[in-house]
Each structure stands twice: as structure tokens, then as C-alpha cells.
Amino acid sequence: MTAALHIGHLSKSFQNTPVLNDISLSLDPGEILFIIGASGCGKTTLLRCLAGFEQPDSGEISLSGKTIFSKNTNLPVRERRLGYLVQEGVLFPHLTVYRNIAYGLGNGKGRTAQERQRIEAMLELTGISELAGRYPHELSGGQQQRVALARALAPDPELILLDEPFSALDEQLRRQIREDMIAALRANGKSAVFVSHDREEALQYADRIAVMKQGRILQTASPHELYRQPADLDAALFIGEGIVFPAALNADGTADCRLGRLPVQSGAPAGTRGTLLIRPEQFSLHPHSAPAASIHAVVLKTTPKARHTEISLRAGQTVLTLNLPSAPTLSDGISAVLHLDGPALFFPGNTL
């Protein structure tokens, strides 16, 4: 199967400062990939290189087997068959919704029967048929993003690129528009690359996630694999919360840390030193005895919150603060037992 997108050893610098460093990845037809990372990691620059707005220093890019960038090739933006959607849609204020979408077909008119049929199909797909005669200033932010998506899909591009398209919307609207937009992409069978800083968004909607740091891809994997089997400590902490401790491996599949001896997930040899990471949801709290892999603690303070209970406790010389979705009623100062559900992650060489 030919990849919808293939990037090979792509690099880009600005004023001798590397921004993209040997980026390689592929995208299957119909697949939705999220690229996540801290601000300045290079994710938007990567998207702009794919679209043709920036020229890489080296590497290759191909769409459905056709080279659009290499040492000897650099197709202009209009010939790349890509849709590009940014934070605020960037609609033409003097054109109606209908004509904004028609502009995606190249002439802004939508006069032929085939063009009208395509525009009407995109209006229906994105749920904005009743808005066809309105102007951008008459639309909400969410409606404008729907129009921008319809315009991007109108010419039937090989790939859709989306640069944090929901970040300017409020939380409730963002959730609805995000779900509708993902559904529209899947209904149209389109491959898409999202740039996002929202890891929860990526975990929920991506087929695969690429984690970037300082111009490099740390790991590309399914949401489940990335969360459960991160390649390194940086990827683990970016994709989810974690409580970390220096630790040393034992021969029996455990590691010694400040909380005691705990089971770990690692193939490193005994004696290896590194960092142990526990996901917060792995902890459960019991007022009395609990199964193996338990930690004796003293409750310092419990604070009920809207969706969880915040519990501060001391285990040995270590003070922990946990947000537990449900917890037994515990008085401050009472002894309790923390149970660890499943092995902790262990990363050799990552010492704190």
C-alpha cells in the first residue's frame, strides 16, 4: 500500500539554528496523525514545509507516491494537492460562505454544475448548508472553522494539514467542533496531520501520535502504545502525568526507590540505574491492608474537588499529592496503604 504521506530525513534551519532535525515518518491512507510537542519544538514548521510555505534544507516529501520535495524537486503550494487549516480559518471577509468554499476550487465562482454539486456536498458534510449565503462577520468562531474545513476539502486534496484549528474556541464549542471535524474527515476518507499542544485531544482522536522535542521526533505510536510503552522519559511525561523517582533495578523485575521496592516494566539488566515513573491512576488508597506492591503512608490532608479528591500523604520521607477519582473517607493523620496497580515504567540512564 502506497503511503498517503512519506517524509524522509527532513531537516530545516533558520539562521544556522536547527528547527527540524532528520524527521522521518509515514502516514497511511485515511489515517489521522497528531503531532504534539511544546511550543518551539518545530511542529508548525514541519507542517509549513509539507504545505510548501517553507523550503527544507534537505530530505524528501512524497504524497501518494508522488515526490513534492527533494534535492531536485520543489512543487509550488498550488500543485501539492494539500488542504491547510490554521487556528482562525482565514476566510475572505467580502465573500459569502458559498463563495469562500468555491474559492477552494480555484475560481471563487462555483458556476458549473460539477462545482455547485461539490460545494453543496461540502456544505452538507460540515453541517453548514443553511449558512451558504452569510458573510464571515455573521458567523461564530466555530462556524467559521467549519467553512474553512469545507473550503480545504472542496478540491479533494490528497492530505489535510491542520495547525491547532480548535485553540481559539472556548472549551464547550471546541469539543463539539472537534468531534464534527474529525467525523467529517473520516467520512470523506481523508488522511490528516494535526498539530496540537493538547495531549488529551491527541489521545482521544488520533490513530497515531508523533511526539516532538527540539526538532526531533521522539516517538510515533498509537495512543495506547505511547501512553503504556513510551520510548523515553520525555515522551512519557509529555503524553501524560507521572510521579518520578530515581531508582535501581533488581534481578526479580522490581526496582528500589524512595517508596520502597516496586514492580517495574523494563528489559534492562539488574543494577541499572535510572528513573521510575508511576501514572497517577495506578494508585489506589486503602484504609487498611492491601495486596502486594503496597506502600504504607500517613494521610496529611484530604481536599474534595469537583471530579476527584486531592490527597496529600507521606510515605517514608516522601510527600505525595494524588488526585483520585474516588477515595475512602480518611481523617487527617490516619495510616493508610497505597496500592500500585500494575508495574511502574523504568527508563535507564534518565537520572533525576
Swiss-Prot record:
CDD domains with a match to the protein in the record: ABC_Carb_Solutes_like (cd03259)
Functional note: Part of the ABC transporter complex FbpABC involved in Fe(3+) ions import. Responsible for energy coupling to the transport system.
Catalyzed reactions: Fe(3+)(out) + ATP + H2O = Fe(3+)(in) + ADP + phosphate + H(+)
Catalytic class of the enzyme: translocase
Self-association state and partner proteins as the record states: The complex is composed of two ATP-binding proteins (FbpC), two transmembrane proteins (FbpB) and a solute-binding protein (FbpA).
A cellular-component GO term for this protein: plasma membrane
Membrane topology: Peripheral membrane protein
Entries under PROSITE patterns matching the protein: ABC_TRANSPORTER_1, ABC_TRANSPORTER_2, FBPC
Claim: Hydrolase is one of the keywords in the record: no
EC number: 7.2.2.7
Transmembrane segments: none
Official protein name in the record: Fe(3+) ions import ATP-binding protein FbpC
Positions of the ABC transporter domain: 5-239
Sorted UniProt keywords: ATP-binding, Cell inner membrane, Cell membrane, Ion transport, Iron, Iron transport, Membrane, Nucleotide-binding, Translocase, Transport
Family: Belongs to the ABC transporter superfamily. Fe(3+) ion importer (TC 3.A.1.10) family.
Molecular function as annotated in GO: ABC-type ferric iron transporter activity; ATP binding; ATP hydrolysis activity
InterPro entries per record: AAA+_ATPase, ABC_SmlMolc_Importer, ABC_transporter-like_ATP-bd, ABC_transporter-like_CS, ABC_transpr_FbpC, FbpC_C, FbpC_RD, P-loop_NTPase
Pfam family name, one: ABC_tran
Subcellular location: Cell inner membrane
Keyword check for Signal: no
List of residues binding ATP: G37, A38, S39, G40, C41, G42, K43, T44
